[in-house]
Amino acid sequence: MRKKIVAGNWKMNLNKSEADILYNDLESKTYPDDVEVIIAPASIYLDSFNNASKVSISSQDVSANNNGAFTGEFSAEMLSSINLRFAIVGHSERRTFHKETDLSLIHI
């Protein structure tokens, strides 16, 4: 049986101390075995929360590019190198503000 996923995208909210409080609260909870809880904190906090035992960590985005002059973007290889298993792809805000399309997302 596949696990149910409960995910929360923190977007560009919470300073580090606020994020720590929420993260620690989520880590202190008990979750059913058939549920995977995933959080997508701001990118600046990804590595600091990536030692979670009960909560999985996701990037809020992943670049279609493997490397190059793409300031502020993260490749799948970079995210994988810090053991991230999840990334949000095709979010409505990325589509609206960055003009991402189904076609551009196929390359990710």
Where are these regions (language model features)?
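Conserved N-terminal beta1-alpha1 strand-loop-helix module at the mouth
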Residues: 1-74, 81-84
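Short, glycine-rich nucleotide/cofactor-binding loops
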Residues: 13-15, 92-93, 97
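Glycine/threonine-rich flexible loop motifs
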Residues: 67-69, 94-101
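Short acidic/polar active-site loop segments enriched in Thr and Asp
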Residues: 85, 90
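Extended, folded domain segments that form the structural surfaces/walls around functional sites
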Residues: 75-76, 80, 96-99
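Conserved small/polar residues in nucleotide/adenosyl-binding loops
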Residues: 106-108
